[in-house]
Each structure stands twice: as structure tokens, then as C-alpha cells.
Amino acid sequence: MDAVTTYEVFSAAQWAGLRAATPLPLTEGDLMVLRGLNERLSLDEVATIYLPLSRLLNLHVGAAQQLRRVKDTFLGRPVGRRPFVIGIAGSVAVGKSTTARVLQALLARWPDHPRVDLVTTDGFLYPNAVLASRAGLHRKGFPESYDLRRLVQFLADLEAGVEAIDVPVYSHATYDVVAGKAQTVRQPDIVILEGLNVLQGPERAAAIAVSDFFDLGIYVHADEADLERWYIERFLTLRATAFRDPSSYFHRYAAMGDDEARAFALQIWRTINGPNLTENILPTRARADVVLEKGPDHAVRAVHLRRL
């Protein structure tokens, strides 16, 4: 990753020193649940990278809560209940979902904010039938494939302190939004919103962007050559596992041989995921407050922290 003057850069070893004796609340059993497909996340990496990050986020949450109390007191109104919102962005196959799950687990262990909800933007994709009638399913994951109005309304409701908000649910097995199913968000202390394009700016002047609602943005970065390799490895693993389920949208790929599956996954990367990364996702990295830079082994090797 190129050096960016607006960030302070810490090696993994330097960042680990910022843990400040924070105890590690997770076990290897917890990691088995949190770890993503083909990822080698270890307790050591959680302790050296994610635990210090959770400490930083905890300090940010406390400061934001105090600032809101001061503002509400100044305005002479009751102290409102609004969650601290964290956005996590990054490419397909980079491990942002695992990052989100680990941070959710760690942040929920801090006593001041035990209720941490994780919401993915997959649920805000237009249903397949709508996408097929518009740009086509090959554009799924590109900015135009999301119902941004609905996503912004969800975030506005969070901001307003709405007591219960229903969020659409996406199924990776059926490759579609699940009709009639919802995740209910009930005034949590923290909301983590994870998705490819969550750090994008507004499409036009004066428009509201999803990232306008974030208290802090995180971008998970890796070199494209590594991302391509990880994507192909993940596809091959899914072909031998989840794709074998007859109800899976991708069941037809389960019978592919190794060479055919590799070629197919590479084609998907080169024609869909790669261009989306280059055109839409990577340009949003500069909007992040924290960049987690991964090496070829999927481990975070540096943390880029925006200067105040």
C-alpha cells in the first residue's frame, strides 16, 4: 500500500504495543465461529491487531457519547439514544466480514456498550428479479445494485433513535434477498455496517451518502493479486462444500473439475469483482479513519490511522 501523508502507519508489532494490558476475552472456540472461510485468523492476531483496535474504538465511543450529552444539555433537551456507527469496507474476499464479527465480539465485552449489532449491506441489494430487469445480475455488488434510499433511511432511523428497525436479510445460499425475513435492530449501543461500498461519497452535490452517518470508517486493504488468489481459493472451497447443497443457487458449479473451476472463478474476478474494486471500492479507501493492511498470508501487517 502506498504511503499516505494523512495517516500514521504502525507495523503489527508497533500496533500491538497499544493494547495497554487490555485482557483478551476470546478463546480458540470463539474464533472457530468468527473465522471466515479459508482465513487463518489466530488468537495472536486478535491480541496484536484487533484488541488494540477495540480499545481505540471504545475510547471513540466514550468520547462521542460525552459530546452528545454536552450538546443535548446545551440545547436544553433530553439526552437522546443514538448508537455509535462503524462502517467497514473492502473488496470481495479481503475478510471484512470476519473483521466485523471479531470487532463485534470484542466491543460487546466492554462494559459501557454491551449491545453491538452487525448489519451487512447485502440485505439492501435489490432482489434478483429487480436486478435482472435493470442492469443485470452481473452488476450485483456495484453501487447501482443497492437500494440506497432504503439503506439511508435505515441509518436515519438509527440517528433518530427509532426503537425497532427491521433490516432485510440476504441469503448467500439462494443468492438473493429473503422475502418476508428481517433482522430487527433495537437501539443497540454500537452498529457495525459492513459492505463493499459503504465508504462511498454522495453521487451528487448536496446528496446524502451512507458514510455521512458513520462515526468511524474502517477499510480492509490487500494487494489485488492476493485478493484474486483468495477469491479463487474460496470459490474452490465452496465448490467442495456449500455448493454441494442441491438448494444452493451455485449447485451447478459443484460438479466442475479443478481446472474448470479455477478458470471460471478467475473469469468472475477479472470481469466483475476486479473492475468493481478498481472503479468503486478502492477509491473509497482514502475516506477511512483506519486502514487495516493485509499481507499475502491474510494477516494484518500494518495499521494506518488517520491523523486528527
Curated annotation (Swiss-Prot):
InterPro entries: P-loop_NTPase, PanK, PRK/URK
Pathway: Cofactor biosynthesis; coenzyme A biosynthesis; CoA from (R)-pantothenate: step 1/5
List of residues binding ATP: 90-97
UniProt catalytic activity: (R)-pantothenate + ATP = (R)-4'-phosphopantothenate + ADP + H(+)
GO molecular function: ATP binding; pantothenate kinase activity
Similarity field: Belongs to the prokaryotic pantothenate kinase family.
Protein name: Pantothenate kinase
Source organism per UniProt: Sorangium cellulosum (strain So ce56)
Recorded name of the encoding gene: coaA
